[in-house]
Design a protein with these regions (language model features):
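A short core secondary-structure module
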Residues: 124, 137, 143-182
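N-terminal glycine-rich flavin-associated loop
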Residues: 83-104
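A generic structural signal for well-ordered coil/turn residues at beta-strand boundaries
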Residues: 94, 117-119, 152-154, 168-169, ...
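Alpha-helical interface subdomain recognition
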Residues: 1-82, 101-105, 117, 133, ...
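Short Ser/Thr-interspersed hydrophobic loop/turn segments at strand-loop and sheet-helix junctions
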Residues: 51, 75-79, 175-179, 203-204
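Cytochrome P450 C-terminal beta-domain/meander region
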Residues: 128-141, 296
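Flexible, small-/acidic-enriched active-site or ligand-binding loops
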Residues: 146-147, 176-213
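Solvent-exposed alpha-helices and their adjacent loops that cap or buttress functional pockets
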Residues: 90, 113-115, 131-133, 148-152, ...
Length: 365
């Protein structure tokens, strides 16, 4: 395994950082946080024009045909800049589910729109979503909590369980987010992150909306979730790297007791420990991305990366607030932007404890 970046990946990382430093300072992040949509359409369109929304999609679906590692490089910079919007939800998770499905009609209908930013697709995977059959196709009913960006989504992919007496496993269906009998209620969240309760009231769906076949959606869902976890870990890594840079800069500038606080051993240890944590997390994240790119089993590697990213989130939050001290707990300071998003990422797709349990189970086998 060679985790050094290719020349193209280095260019992608550098140009992404330059673009985001100019187009997405923390003032833009704060503006998006206060908005109803949770993202800024102008910035979204600019990222689409750069090809970022279709990095890992094939060219025949409007993407640029990059690898998961390419996407990981990009999202490390996206996380570093706290870029708001449904990139992970639509451009990674939903796009991958569609790409893995055997439904060519839905691929052609949705993937080009995801890549050019005109469509936003989200995922609902609550335990209370059920599908059953009727004379014309299937019926979707139930509700799902924590559906990200449902308020601005054009389509919702629903991961459903079978109703009593129906098929034996998960069925994936795609529905128009503005269809009748779909009700969306915004939920309270950290950093005003746009999550919704989505309710589906016995919606009739044709078989053309089924992704991957009746009761055959679990493999596509699991594969997409693995890739999404790697990308989310890359975002966490980028945020932690930026926090490290912030605290090192501040420690060198802040003078107390007649000298910079960077000369105090306790502060040095905080910064050094965070540097080690960032580097070790980066190795695990890129290892998981590499294995998935090689079509190798990566369940354990993804769980290790996710667990380490969760621990890194806490390390970065603790180091940042400890070095910046009291001012970092105010909403005016940028540190709270990083710590609030760290908590969201740690809880998403299974928290640190869950993934440590997954690793333990694998070791015991």
């Amino acid at each position: 395994m060679d985790f050094s970046l290719t020349e193209e990946q280095q260019i992608l990382s550098r140009t992404a950082r330059e673009f985001l430093e100019a187009e997405c300072p923390t003032t833009v992040v704060r503006e998006a946080e206060k908005s109803e949509k949770g993202y800024l359409p102008d910035l979204w369109k600019k990222m689409a024009n750069l090809g970022w929304l279709g990095v890992s999609l094939p060219e025949n679906y409007g993407g640029i045909g990059g690898s998961l590692t390419d996407q990981t490089v990009l999202f490390e910079e996206i996380g570093r800049a706290l870029v708001p919007g449904p990139l992970l939800t639509s451009s990674v998770l939903a796009a991958q589910i569609l790409l893995d499905s055997r439904n060519e009609t839905q691929k052609q209908n949705l993937l080009p729109g995801i890549a050019n930013g005109e469509l936003i697709v989200t995922l609902a995977r609550g335990e209370r979503l059920e599908t059953s059959s009727d004379d014309t196709g299937i019926v979707l009913s139930g509700e799902s909590l924590f559906v990200p960006f449902a308020g601005v989504a054009s389509h919702i992919i629903c991961a459903t369980r079978p109703a009593v007496g129906a098929w034996p496993d998960t069925t994936l269906v795609v529905v128009d987010a503005d269809a009748d009998k779909i009700f969306k209620t915004r939920m309270g969240s950290i950093a005003n992150y746009p999550q919704y309760l989505a309710e589906f009231d016995d919606i009739s769906i044709s078989l053309e909306a089924v992704l991957g076949g009746i009761a055959e959606g679990r493999p596509s869902l699991d594969a997409a979730l693995q890739r999404a976890m790697v990308i989310q870990c890359a975002e966490t890594l980028g945020r932690a790297q930026k926090v490290l840079e912030m605290v090192v800069q501040y420690a060198g500038d802040r003078v107390q007791f007649g000298r910079p606080i960077a000369t105090f051993q306790a502060v040095q240890h905080r910064c050094a420990d965070l540097k080690v944590a960032v580097d070790s997390c980066r190795m695990l994240v890129y290892q998981a991305a590499w294995r998935l790119d090689q079509d190798m089993p990566a369940h354990n590697e993804v769980s290790m990366a996710k667990a380490k990213a969760g621990i890194l989130s806490r390390n970065a939050t603790e180091a940042g607030h400890s070095v910046f001290a009291g001012i970092s707990f105010t909403v005016e300071h940028d540190m709270q932007l990083y710590s609030s998003r760290a908590k969201i990422s740690e809880a998403n797709f299974g928290d640190t404890g869950y993934h440590l349990d997954q690793i333990s189970i694998a070791v015991e086998r």
